[in-house]
A protein has these predicted regions:
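The feature captures the beta-strand-to-loop junction immediately N-terminal to the Walker
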Residues: 17-19
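Helix-to-loop junction immediately C-terminal to a conserved catalytic motif
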Residues: 32
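Conserved ABC transporter NBD signature motif
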Residues: 40-50, 59
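Catalytic Walker B motif of ABC-type/P-loop ATPase nucleotide-binding domains
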Residues: 149-152
């Protein structure tokens, strides 16, 4: 990454779009403190995301992170996978899952309902469909009670209908929980459909930023590329 300058307002649904290897996932890892920039800086609520920063470590649970791999534990139940999300917030170890506070179990049930998985609490994660696994990953992140949700290619390899179901779910959770959502996509059309702002990353540099209101592009900032060329990069018809 080089010369990437992003300013993301609280409550925004912000999409980062780019082809494989462009640096999108690296950006998310920098935001949650998993990586440290060799140059430049990142601030979240005036704090630098760094595991050595004690103040940042205390507020880490406010950043929900969904990796592209989803990170589910395959041989445990949906409920236990979701409860794992609360462990950092409660400063507990995974070994206490069976003695979890009743109020947290009720909160997990509420979130299961929010993500459309009520009645599947005891099902093992490996038995779930691709869309269901993503719902569990979202629920686990929401159990952290975050203010920021980072999601890396959350709908990759899903069909058109399931992709939009998952995106609708995230939008619903964002509104109900007052979240800032920062999501990595490779699909420009999907990003424009759901995000308030879209940044396009190419070879580690931001080459475009778009502001979106409804179906209208209200702000278009770019260097050398036209919007038609950007759309063509991502196999999207700008007329659609």
């Amino acid at each position: 990454l080089e010369g990437v300058n992003l300013s993301i307002d609280r409550g925004t649904n912000y999409a980062i779009v780019g082809q494989s290897g462009s640096g999108k996932s690296t950006l998310l890892k920098l935001m949650n403190g998993m990586m440290t920039p060799s140059k430049g800086s990142i601030k979240i609520d005036y704090l630098t995301p760094n595991m050595n920063n004690k103040k940042f470590k205390k507020m880490m649970h406010t950043i929900g992170y969904i990796p592209q791999s989803l990170g589910l534990v395959k041989n445990i139940s949906v409920m236990d996978n979701i409860l794992i999300g609360a462990l950092p917030r409660l400063n507990l170890m995974q070994s206490v899952l069976k003695q979890f506070p009743e109020n947290e179990i009720q909160e997990a049930k509420n979130i299961l309902k929010l993500v459309g998985l009520s009645g599947k609490e005891s099902r093992k994660a490996y038995m779930l469909s691709g869309g269901e696994k993503r719902r569990v990953a979202i629920a686990r992140a929401l159990m952290q009670k975050p203010t920021i949700l980072l999601a890396d290619e959350i709908v990759s390899e899903l069909d058109h209908v399931t992709s939009r179901e998952i995106m609708d779910l995230i939008l619903d959770a964002q509104k109900k929980m007052n979240l800032t959502a920062i999501m990595v996509h490779h699909d420009m059309k999907l990003a424009l459909e759901y995000a308030n702002r879209v940044a396009v990353i190419k070879e580690g540099q931001k080459i475009l930023e778009i502001g979106v209101e409804g179906d209208t592009i209200v702000d278009f900032q770019t260097g050398d590329l036209s919007i038609e060329e950007i759309m063509e990069m991502h196999n999207t018809d700008p007329k659609e």
